[in-house]
Amino acid sequence: FENHRRRTYVGLSLMAAQAFFYNAIFFTYALILIDFYDVASDRVGLYLLPFAIGNFLGPVLIGRMFDTHGRRIMIAFTYIASGLLLALTGWLFVRNLIDATTQTACWTIIFFFASCAASSAYLTVSETFPLEIRAMAIAFFYAVGTGIGGVLAPSLFGLLIDTGSRVSVFWGYLFGSALMIFAGCVAWIWGINAERKSLEDVARPLTFVGTE
């Protein structure tokens, strides 16, 4: 990673942000619905379907744009859009302007973009490092992302939800939003235009690569 510092920063930013963002919402949405919207626990599962639809349609409808419009611009767009939409949803939530149905609709729209953002993070770390360390890079960034998203995010949001305060949850949303926007900016500044290029052109083998 010494010879690819900027790519390492991009990979860490993208993986950590999407992991926190995804897990913070996905693994606490049931608590939000039950604690703040009085949704019966046996009906919470019904609200999962829109999540699945948003997650599916995002990559299907705009995934190809990562090749036609460019990796860097689309990664930045999906990350920043996801962050801004979460901030807006958080504001509507804290102002009590949405109910369980519209809250779920907002999450569905957010994950339409966030699913592409998350996919692009894995794509980025898999194609921007030399072949010799590609598997190691994927494992490393996945471990970091899982540590942040799989442990920190649900724990933090669980504590915020337990306060019973919409304001506390809103601050959690803003933090997740800030992470996504920051990662999007990092990708815009330091991202690689890898579209329609061979992997060897994107990241030359270690026997040929010099310091960037």
Predicted regions, residues:
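Extracytoplasmic gate region of multi-pass secondary transporters
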Residues: 3-59, 149-154
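Helix-to-loop junctions at the C-terminal end of transmembrane segments
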Residues: 59-70, 161
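Cytoplasmic membrane-interface "Motif A"-like loop-to-helix N-cap segments
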Residues: 68-79
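C-terminal ends and interior cores of transmembrane alpha-helices
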Residues: 81-97
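Hydrophobic core of transmembrane alpha-helices in multi-pass small-molecule transporters
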Residues: 100-116
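Intracellular juxtamembrane helix-capping segments at the cytosolic ends
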Residues: 116-129
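A membrane-interface helix-boundary motif in multi-pass transporters
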Residues: 159-178
